[in-house]
Design a protein with these regions (language model features):
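Flexible loop and strand-edge segments within Gram-negative outer membrane beta-barrel domains
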Residues: 23, 199, 230-303, 330-347, ...
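Periplasmic N-terminal accessory/gating domains of Gram-negative outer-membrane beta-barrel systems
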Residues: 48-103, 107-140, 157
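Transmembrane beta-barrel wall of Gram-negative outer-membrane proteins
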Residues: 171-198, 208-243, 251-275, 312-320, ...
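Surface-exposed extracellular loop regions of Gram-negative outer-membrane beta-barrel proteins
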Residues: 283, 330-335, 378-390, 414, ...
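Outer membrane beta-barrel strand-and-loop segments of large Gram-negative receptors
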Residues: 303-309, 351-355, 450-456, 462, ...
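Signature of Gram-negative outer-membrane beta-barrel scaffolds
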Residues: 326-421, 432-433, 548-551
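Gram-negative outer-membrane beta-barrel transporters
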Residues: 483-486, 507-594
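C-terminal beta-signal and adjacent terminal beta-strands/loops
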Residues: 575, 584-601, 616-620, 626-686
Length: 686
């Protein structure tokens, strides 16, 4: 198989490169939650018992180079060890060999699906809305369920109870505003953000793209009420939508709408109760017009959840927490329309859990964070779809079924000295919402399927061990962790099948086993004019599914053998700061044809193995400079950036075609999204 690179961007997004089109940035000191970067951050990491947990320093992430001028939480955490982004054109992140769909992403208790805009260029997280963020990539704490890879727990920033704040940012492609402050002083506050792109305006300037639609918006809002000290009631809301289309040819639309209510109350100094109710609706939609026939694929994922938990402080060194949760899931796995024909498949499931967790320290040096989660998932009846007879699809056999699991989880820490410790952990987890993406398409869509009497719950067992240390002044800290994870009931499409093949997903997927193992290293500099870190991950992820690859183990599509990240921030003066990041990762596994042949005038390819080849490695350098001017009434900031500074064309899509120079040959063609992209934005903060 011969390869060549086509150094051009995809048709729509190449216009953005030509126009140097960039959206927004924001003042680092006030956007992602102000945190003073000192040695205390290293001490907090060292003190944590939980293995594989990252309490994200949002102020530091805000100073990293921004893609298209936009600070991005998800792209920033992709610089952490054991985490890597899905790549250009995809906005998810993958943790320790898991896929992006195996992560639980929550905002104030609201579950978010596919949290990205414009095929991953931006994430759903508006940087000036987020107040806190924690990533759990090791054994997940017992209070979380529904994820076998990681949990990203975030929360919207509360409005100030005493003073008003506001900011506005304008870039070439998007603008955003933020406002917060008291409604009732010392009792009730609000915080709201809004962001809207105007890519369409630039596309209208180019005649060949006037029929193209590309825009997104998102809004967040939060009310924070404190009736008395220690108690609070929070009401949160988020909504976002993407629209990408070429009129009369194709269209892709997706978005999240969610809301939550959280009530926390204290009873004395040792007892805390928390009640959270939330709702999410995620709705992707794809439409095409081919050969005079309109085709449409729509989905939705809706969940309603209620959680009650209680925390008991037994002593200064011992804490107990218990809780229960109930979640109702309703999924339209697919609704397909082919001209006048229509078929759909809707499923429902009910998941109930109870958990207990304990954190404690013994003999000053030994700490434990342990717990167990009991989970009962009930398969509920589905709505039979209207069959498209020409496809001869069998009617699925909907049968109620119950799945029960016991999921123990534990993390242990032993302090060798005050500056060095070792950790170990073990955890079981399960997932009943399956998202399966075709490896043959780069669209940001998955086919969703609930656990049924045919599709079994995904199960994961993870083991971890690590070492961490720091200098006495907190200037430097470092860590090393190793992990091994095994999975059961991992699903992939049958050979020759894609997400569009049939509505009944059970008939086009197969289940099997997976395993992932690796080593992670991290070194940080926390104090001084120059701060930053370097992280490296050596890992392997493999899958074995009967009926695929002759039942042999093969590299998973998200396997990355080597993953290296460097990030640095240099404070040049009180007004100027410089930052840069560089990433390198091994190429993505790829299924390539071994033989081609003609059948009735059509070229067909024969594939002997799944993911037997790899795309070229991915590497990129990003740079930025920020100038801030404090003022009497408001502060201003100019941000300048260069994405992909040495113009590396990383693979976005690789497909195969006949080699015109050799009729019997085949060549691989690579397409890339972005070359060198400059950015500029202006922010004003009251």
């Amino acid at each position: 198989v011969r390869t060549r690179s086509i150094i051009t961007a995809a048709s729509i997004l190449s216009t953005l490169n030509v126009l140097s089109a960039e959206p927004t940035d924001t003042i680092a000191a006030g956007s992602l939650g102000e945190v003073t970067v000192t040695g205390s951050a290293a001490r907090q990491r060292l003190a944590s018992t939980q293995i594989g947990a990252e309490q994200l320093e949002l102020s530091r992430l805000a100073r990293l180079p921004a893609m298209f001028g936009e600070n991005d939480l998800i792209r920033s955490i992709s610089l952490m060890p054991g985490v890597h982004g899905e790549g250009d054109g995809a906005g998810g992140f993958e943790v320790r060999g898991g896929t992006s769909s195996q992560n639980l992403v929550r905002l104030d208790g609201i579950t978010l699906y596919n949290p990205s805009h414009v095929m991953g260029i931006f994430s759903t997280f508006n940087d000036n809305a987020v107040g806190r963020a924690t990533l759990y990539k090791g054994p997940i704490p017992s209070e979380y369920g529904g994820a076998t890879a990681s949990v990203l727990e975030t929360s919207l920033a509360n409005g100030d109870l005493e003073k008003y704040d506001a900011s506005a940012t304008i870039g070439i492609l998007a603008a955003k505003v933020m406002a917060s402050g008291p409604v009732v002083k010392d009792r009730l506050s609000f915080a709201a953000t809004a962001r809207r792109s105007y890519v369409d305006a630039f596309l209208q300037m180019v005649p060949q793209y006037r029929s193209t639609v590309m825009n997104f918006y998102d809004v967040t809002a939060k009310l924070h009420y404190t009736p008395r000290r220690g108690d609070h009631l929070d009401v949160s809301f988020i909504a976002g939508r993407d629209n990408m289309a070429i009129k009369r040819v194709m269209g892709m639309y997706w978005g999240n709408v969610g809301a939550s209510v959280d009530w926390l109350t204290r009873r004395g100094e040792r007892l805390v109760f928390a009640t959270t109710g939330s709702f999410t609706n995620y709705s992707p939609d794809m439409r095409m017009s081919m050969a005079g026939t309109d085709q449409k694929l729509t989905e939705y994922v809706r969940n309603f959840s209620l959680t009650e938990k209680v925390g008991i402080t037994l002593s200064d060194s011992h804490r107990l927490e218990a809780g229960l949760s109930s979640e109702l899931l309703r999924v339209k796995s697919a609704e397909m329309e082919y001209g006048d024909h229509r078929e759909l498949d809707i499923r429902s499931g009910w998941e109930n859990s109870v958990w207990v967790a304990y954190d404690g320290t013994f003999a000053e040096r030994f700490s434990v964070a342990s717990g167990v989660r009991l989970n009962l998932y009930s398969v509920m009846s589905g709505r039979p779809f209207r069959k498209f007879e020409a496809m001869a699809e069998p009617t699925p056999d909907y049968r109620p079924e119950n799945y029960f699991s016991v999921e123990p989880r534990i993390s242990l820490k032993y302090d060798i000295t005050q500056l060095h410790n070792i950790k170990a952990g073990f955890g079981l987890s399960s997932q009943n919402l399956h998202a399966i993406r075709s490896s043959s398409t780069s669209f940001p869509f998955d086919r969703y399927a609930l656990t049924s009497n045919v599709v079994k719950p995904e199960r994961a067992v993870q083991y971890g061990i690590g070492y961490a240390g720091m200098t006495a002044d907190g200037m430097f800290d470092w860590s090393a962790e190793g992990y091994y994870k095994s999975l059961r009931n991992v699903y992939d499409y049958q050979d020759g099948r894609t997400m569009f093949s049939q509505v009944n997903i059970e008939s086009i997927i197969l289940g099997g086993r997976g395993r992932s193992y690796g080593l992670e290293f991290m070194f940080r500099k926390n104090v001084g004019r120059l701060t930053g870190w370097i992280s490296y991950t050596l890992s392997r992820t493999r899958t074995r599914i009967p009926g695929i690859n002759d039942g042999r183990w093969y590299d998973a599509s998200n396997d990355r053998r080597h993953d290296l990240s460097l990030a640095a921030v240099f404070r040049l003066s009180d007004r100027w700061s410089l930052s840069g990041s560089w990433i390198f990762s091994s190429g993505q596994p790829l299924t390539a044809p071994d033989v081609k042949y003609e059948l009735d005038g059509t070229t067909c390819y024969y594939y002997s193995q799944r993911n037997g080849y790899r795309t070229p490695p991915v590497h990129r350098l990003d740079l930025s400079a920020t100038w801030t001017r404090p003022g009497r009434h408001f502060d201003t900031q100019w941000s300048f950036g260069i994405y992909n500074a040495y113009c590396r064309y990383n693979p976005y899509i690789v497909y195969f075609e006949d080699d015109p120079s050799k009729p019997s040959g085949t060549r691989a063609v690579q397409q890339s999204l972005f070359g060198l992209v400059p950015s500029i934005s202006y922010t004003i903060k009251l």
